[in-house]
Design a protein with these regions (language model features):
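N-terminal auxiliary segments of SAM/dcSAM-dependent transferases
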Residues: 1-34
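Conserved alpha-helix/loop element of class I SAM-dependent methyltransferases that forms part
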Residues: 58-80
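Conserved class I S-adenosyl-L-methionine
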Residues: 79-90
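Class I SAM-dependent methyltransferase SAM/SAH-binding core
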Residues: 85, 93-141
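A short SAM/SAH-binding and catalytic strip from SAM-dependent methyltransferases
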Residues: 151-166
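A short glycine-rich, Lys/Arg-flanked "PGG" loop and its adjoining helix->strand segment in the class I
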Residues: 168-179
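Conserved beta-strand signature within the Rossmann-like core of class I S-adenosyl-L-methionine
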Residues: 180-188
Length: 242
């Protein structure tokens, strides 16, 4: 049993997704934690899973892993042969889903130290290495490790569009994938709308338009529920690098 209780606030007005928060009761003390304060959430063992998987029904790790597996197999290939770079890997829930489907080699990158600590604490057998830092400016040993790997697939789940991972970081990770490699990610549906003006959305539209991403499948689905119980639609994309 976890040593905490987590409550969702009673919200009359709609909070934007990057303003959402929960109330954590731990050791008799209550504190408010924003959903995007990942370091705080990862520091409490089991809080991320309780909050996002249990209470808010987050389905993205399973969705991306399933769609990627389906497309790889449709192409006559095996997920067991993939060497995955999981960008914005968090506490390893995406990597865990990929492992369950037969992926044998995974390396993680996240800018948040607490994310790496949580993955090593809770899912120590998922990643071969877990590097902490900005992938576009990693320490030399981490950069050398990634360069020496035969990365064939990039995954980036629930980490794009709110400033969590900037376009430059996504491009740096994309550059590690060879021709014919796989790219699987998700993004809030409105971020792909031209009217949003999001730099990342503009990058994705550009990469699809100029052929740097050849989309194999694209699916709109419910990423999770909001604190008020509304469905949050996201778009999952599995593509190949030409």
């Amino acid at each position: 049993m976890p040593g905490f209780v987590v409550h969702l606030p009673e919200v009359d007005e709609g909070l934007s997704q990057d303003q959402e928060y929960c109330l954590l009761v731990e050791d008799g003390r209550e504190r408010r934690i924003r959903f995007h304060d990942y370091g705080e959430i990862y520091s409490v063992r089991g809080l991320y899973e309780k909050l996002f998987a249990d209470l808010l029904k987050c389905s993205s790790p399973e969705m991306i892993a399933t769609l990627l597996t389906e497309e790889v197999e449709r192409a006559g290939e095996s997920v067991a042969d993939l060497h995955v770079l999981d960008l914005g890997a968090g506490n390893g829930m995406v990597g865990e889903q990929l492992r369950a489907r037969g992926v044998e080699r995974l390396v993680a990158v996240d800018i948040i130290e607490e994310a790496a600590d949580a993955a090593r604490r809770d899912r120590p057998d998922v990643y071969e290495r877990y590097h902490v830092g900005d992938i576009s400016d990693l320490p030399e040993d981490a950069a050398n490790d990634l360069a020496a790997r035969d990365i064939t697939c990039l995954t980036c789940v629930a980490a794009l569009g709110f400033g969590d991972i900037p376009p430059a970081a996504f491009l740096a990770a994309y550059d590690l994938v060879p021709s014919g490699g796989w790219v699987a990610f998700n993004i809030k549906d409105t971020f792909l709308d031209k009217a949003t003006g999001s730099a990342f959305a503009a990058l994705i539209r550009e990469m699809i338009g100029d052929g740097r991403l050849r989309v194999c499948t694209q699916r709109t689905y419910t990423h999770r529920l909001s604190v008020s119980g509304d469905k949050l639609p996201y778009v999952a994309i599995v593509a190949r690098k030409p």
